[in-house]
């Protein structure tokens, strides 16, 4: 089954055409600067990279251009659009409506629209992509795969905040969690690599990138995760503060004479390791500054980041009554051996020994703990697009 996987941002559109049977990526690309001057589509297929400069006034234009590229006689990979069996859409927020991926109907689209206030930066773009695809490919089944759905198995005592209960009933203020598709994929893949049933494992998945979150996955289900009502809660991140004392917001409003919105903007875009280091949100830059130039604030930023990850791993081991597997994934998790070692140092009491030679791995599946470790520590590159394609395939197959 050929599945087109679409991930729409406010001015961008990432896509992959995947053969779902074997996960083979037939083509992939990125449409940038949608609705802005100098729009560009970068299309990768058959080992070639094609750049197409053409104005895209909206997501519909972008999807038309993507489809044109896919069927192009020179650099396309399919003869015509009828070869696309289904479209899988990444949707950031499904609120409490969705516990799994779903076939997109008018009712589903309305529910996604109702979640806009929970994800004002992301859901509108996701909706644009869905509507555009429906207009261009009205007869092709479409599936929504939610970042939040995997975490809908959290128990109420894990997802409720200790604030007046009426705010939950009135406004649905609760922990939702994000990166669910990634946490689901790497936990399942880790179990496959170990050749053990996921239903028997306690897994801690660490998705560490510019946005970072950790999940406690017990018997294949998410029982807790570090991001919350929004992706601002939890770990220190590239530019996001993660969890802080809520009183800091009103304190900064008063001291700096700024609005709540301005403070939240600072916490989202000017904080995290960027805020502490004053240098960059890119961990490669921070490692260079800290280890090559001896920059104290860059070192401090890395310490704060690693400490919060370490603390969360420990707390999730407690929440699950132990741990069998710790998995690192995403940009930093997959490609940062030094950061991984830094995080794991002091956690040996959980039952693992790090193999420093194996830990040198970057961007590949590997078990990086020693053979005699009771707990397996692993690197598993995430593959959210493949997970979206597999979910889409499963739902479309069930319609037959």
Swiss-Prot record:
It holds the Pfam family Acetate_kinase. The keyword Cytoplasm applies. ATP binds at residues 14, 207-211, 282-284, 331-335. InterPro entries: Ac/propionate_kinase (IPR004372), Aliphatic_acid_kin_short-chain (IPR000890), Aliphatic_acid_kinase_CS (IPR023865), ATPase_NBD (IPR043129). The record marks 179, 240 as: Transition state stabilizer. Its cofactor is Mg(2+); Mn(2+). The keyword Iron does not apply. Substrate binds at residue 90. Pathway: Metabolic intermediate biosynthesis; acetyl-CoA biosynthesis; acetyl-CoA from acetate: step 1/2. SUPFAM superfamilies: Actin-like ATPase domain. It is found in: Cytoplasm. Mg(2+). Can also accept Mn(2+). Keywords: ATP-binding, Cytoplasm, Kinase, Magnesium, Metal-binding, Nucleotide-binding, Transferase. CDD domains: ASKHA_NBD_AcK_PK. Mg(2+) binds at residues 7, 384. Catalyzes the formation of acetyl phosphate from acetate and ATP. Can also catalyze the reverse reaction. Belongs to the acetokinase family. This is Acetate kinase. It comes from Thermoanaerobacterium thermosaccharolyticum (strain ATCC 7956 / DSM 571 / NCIMB 9385 / NCA 3814 / NCTC 13789 / WDCM 00135 / 2032). The lineage of its organism: Bacteria, Bacillati, Bacillota, Clostridia, Thermoanaerobacterales.
């Amino acid at each position: 089954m050929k599945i087109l996987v679409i991930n729409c941002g406010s001015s961008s559109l990432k896509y992959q055409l995947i053969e779902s049977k074997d996960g083979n990526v037939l083509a992939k690309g990125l449409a940038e600067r949608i609705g802005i001057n100098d729009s560009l589509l970068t299309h990768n297929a058959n080992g070639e990279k094609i750049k197409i400069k053409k104005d895209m006034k909206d997501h519909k234009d972008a999807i038309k251009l993507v489809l044109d590229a896919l069927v192009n006689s020179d650099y396309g990979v399919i003869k015509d659009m009828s070869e696309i069996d289904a479209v899988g859409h990444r949707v950031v927020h499904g609120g409490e409506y969705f516990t799994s991926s779903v076939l997109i109907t008018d009712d589903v689209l309305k529910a996604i629209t109702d979640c806009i206030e929970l994800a004002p930066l992301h859901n509108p773009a996701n909706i644009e992509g869905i509507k555009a695809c429906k207009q261009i490919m009205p007869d092709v089944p479409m599936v929504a795969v939610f970042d939040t759905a995997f975490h809908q198995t959290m128990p109420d005592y894990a997802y409720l905040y200790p604030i007046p209960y009426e705010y939950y009933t009135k406004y649905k203020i609760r922990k939702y969690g994000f990166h669910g598709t990634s946490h689901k994929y790497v936990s399942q893949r880790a179990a496959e690599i170990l050749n053990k049933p996921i239903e028997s494992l306690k897994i801690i998945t660490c998705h560490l990138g510019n946005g970072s979150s950790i999940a406690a996955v017990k018997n294949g289900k998410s029982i807790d995760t570090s991001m919350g009502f929004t992706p601002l809660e939890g770990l220190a991140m590239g530019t996001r503060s993660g969890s802080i004392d809520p009183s800091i917001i009103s304190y900064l409003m008063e001291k700096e004479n700024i609005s709540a919105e301005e403070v939240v903007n600072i916490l989202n875009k000017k904080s995290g390791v960027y805020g502490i280091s004053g240098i960059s949100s890119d961990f490669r830059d921070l490692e260079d500054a800290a280890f090559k130039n001896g920059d104290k604030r860059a070192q401090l930023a890395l310490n704060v980041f690693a400490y919060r990850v370490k603390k969360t791993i420990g707390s999730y081991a407690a929440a699950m009554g132990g741990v069998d597997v710790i998995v690192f994934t995403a940009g930093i998790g997959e490609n940062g051996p030094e950061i991984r070692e830094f995080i794991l140092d002091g956690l040996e009491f959980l039952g693992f020994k790090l193999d420093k030679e194996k830990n040198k791995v970057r961007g590949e599946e590997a078990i990086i703990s020693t053979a005699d470790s009771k707990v397996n520590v692993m690197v598993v590159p995430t593959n959210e697009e493949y997970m979206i394609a597999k979910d889409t395939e499963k739902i479309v197959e069930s319609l037959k």
